[in-house]
Amino acid sequence: MIQFENVTKRFPGGQEALSELTLSVDKGEMVFVTGHSGAGKSTLLNLIALIERPTSGQVIVDGQNTRRVRRRKIPGYRRQIGMVFQDHKLLYDRPVSENVALPLIIAGVSPRDAGKRVRAALDQVGLLHKEKKNPETLSAGEQQRVGIARAIVTRPKLLIADEPTGNLDPELSLEVMRIFRRFNEVGVTLLIASHDIALIDKLGCRRIELDEGRLQEPQFEDDLVVHFEDDYLPQGDDDGWR
């Protein structure tokens, strides 16, 4: 699903955020990217989302070389990718449902179809009952779940997340990871940047570690897998958003 081939990203002034990085993420994997602040985690995700372009090397996403994606084609390219950020940037003058619908409105989806997909996405994150609420009335964890619903409402093949639990307490962080796990179980590929090693180790997923823009030895904590219960989430129809 994702391939980096000798990728270097150098910013003006000569700073190298990534240096000759080669890695791959298979379709259907849930993988974490870890490393110190400034290690290159966000840059790696930005290259996948075409927020940035590599200085050298190739980034291939679902068989498509990002170097060959022209500027006018970037919005269409990004529709295959759901993006979740630590700062979810919700619109506080609009209800939850309209926040989630925004990518569909931009894509020109009909109001009827958009409404169905918004409700399905909110159901998947356990917030269908709050679709008419203002985001300001929600807790920090609920606001992050609105951001996740917005990311998956376009039914992406790939979901990338940059420190999605950075502002949450341990309990809410685990709740968010449980949601990501459920999406992975229905075939979505996930790549998540996080500094929370203790939480990552509980999940038993492959870990890609960066150090000053370079790849370290791969990590896999198969002896620390935790089997999460999904009781807190409504068991919605997975096909509702896939």
Please name every model-derived segment:
Residues 49:
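Helix-to-loop junction immediately C-terminal to a conserved catalytic motif
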Residues 57-65, 77:
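Conserved ABC transporter NBD signature motif
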Residues 94-101:
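Short coil-to-helix segment of the ABC ATPase nucleotide-binding domain corresponding to the Q-loop/switch region
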Residues 133-136, 154, 186:
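Conserved signature/switch motifs of ABC ATPase nucleotide-binding domains
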Residues 134-138, 142-144:
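Conserved ABC ATPase signature
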Residues 159-162:
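Catalytic Walker B motif of ABC-type/P-loop ATPase nucleotide-binding domains
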Residues 170-172:
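Helix N-cap at the start of a conserved alpha-helix in ABC-type nucleotide-binding domains
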